[in-house]
Each structure stands twice: as structure tokens, then as C-alpha cells.
Regions:
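Leucine-biased recognition of intrinsically disordered, low-complexity hydrophobic segments
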Residues: 6-8
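N-terminal intrinsically disordered, cationic/polar leader segments
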Residues: 10-21, 25-64, 71-72, 114-133, ...
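Solvent-exposed interaction patches of small proteins and small membrane subunits
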Residues: 55-62, 81-82, 104-109
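Conserved interaction-surface patches within small, structured recognition/assembly domains
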Residues: 70-86, 95-98
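Residue-level signal for short amphipathic helical patches enriched in basic/charged
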Residues: 85, 101, 126
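Primarily the active-site beta-strand->alpha-helix module of PP2C/PPM metal-dependent phosphatases
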Residues: 91
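Glycine-rich phosphate/pyrophosphate-binding loops
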Residues: 100-117
Length: 149
């Protein structure tokens, strides 16, 4: 199969986190990094209004952050939105890291990119708590899908 073959490269959660770390290391200061977060948020795929329901709201976030999940071929797929642009950028990073992986991979993943890019120390306490709530909710969805198997 040399012609017309689709080669699908699947990156591990750690590889994706390493890519994000490399991207953030490119920027000189936090104003550039915040702008990058804002741009990431603006590029999130459109979130259906039908998914903006209370059961998809992440508890513990100061702003409204909706997280929807689905399960297909043993992979958890996430989509999200927020009414706050920084939160939208943060959740876009988390979706990039976790979406398209098995529940087991998500549950066992060590989320280290947040600290390595310095994001945790450049967020207000309420935003930092919201970030932890986002990660927690992603892992809860993965646990639920694992239990259903």
C-alpha cells in the first residue's frame, strides 16, 4: 500500500503535552502566552447550543464552561465552550490533550504541561481552581465510560 494510503499518527497524551510545552516556550512573556490562549479559544470548534445545558456545566469554574463528551470506538471525545475567553483557551488545551484517547489513558495521565508552561502560577486562585475542576471533570467522564465497558 504505497499509493493512496492514509497514515494516521496517533500521539500519546504525554507527546501532546510536550508539544504544548514547546509551543509556549516559543513566547517571550506572558502577554504573548495569554494572547496565544485567547487565539486557541477563538479557534475552538463551534459548540452546539443544545449542549449548553446545566448538566454540561463544570462546577467550580467562576465563568461558565460547558464540557460535553461522547464515546466512540473506545475513545472519549470532548467538546467544550466557555463564556470567558481565557477559560475557553484553557479548555481548548485540555481537549487537545485528552480528546481521542481511551478512558484508561485519560485516567492514568499525569497532567504536567500546566505546571511546565507556568500556567498555574499565572492564573488567579479562582481560575486555577476552575482549571483543576476542568481536569477533574474530564477524568470523571473517562471513569464513567470505563465503568460502562
Amino acid at each position: 500500500c504505497w499509493d493512496n494510503c492514509l497514515i494516521l499518527t496517533v500521539h500519546s497524551i504525554q507527546q501532546i503535552q510536550d508539544q504544548i510545552i514547546d509551543e509556549f516556550n516559543f513566547f517571550k512573556d506572558w502577554s504573548e502566552k495569554y494572547q496565544y490562549l485567547i487565539d486557541l479559544g477563538k479557534n475552538l470548534p463551534e459548540f452546539k447550543d443544545s449542549n449548553r445545558i446545566d448538566s454540561n456545566l463544570i462546577k467550580g469554574c467562576q465563568s461558565k464552561v460547558w464540557l460535553n463528551s461522547s464515546f466512540d470506538n473506545n475513545l472519549v471525545i470532548f467538546e467544550a465552550d466557555s463564556d470567558a475567553i481565557i477559560s475557553k483557551g484553557i479548555i481548548s488545551l485540555l481537549i487537545r490533550v485528552f480528546s481521542g484517547h481511551t478512558p484508561e489513558e485519560i485516567i492514568s495521565a499525569n497532567v504536567d504541561f500546566i505546571e511546565k508552561i507556568g500556567l498555574n502560577s499565572h492564573l488567579s486562585q479562582t481560575r486555577a481552581n476552575g482549571l483543576l475542576s476542568m481536569v477533574k471533570q474530564i477524568k470523571i467522564y473517562a471513569l464513567a465510560y470505563q465503568a460502562k465497558k
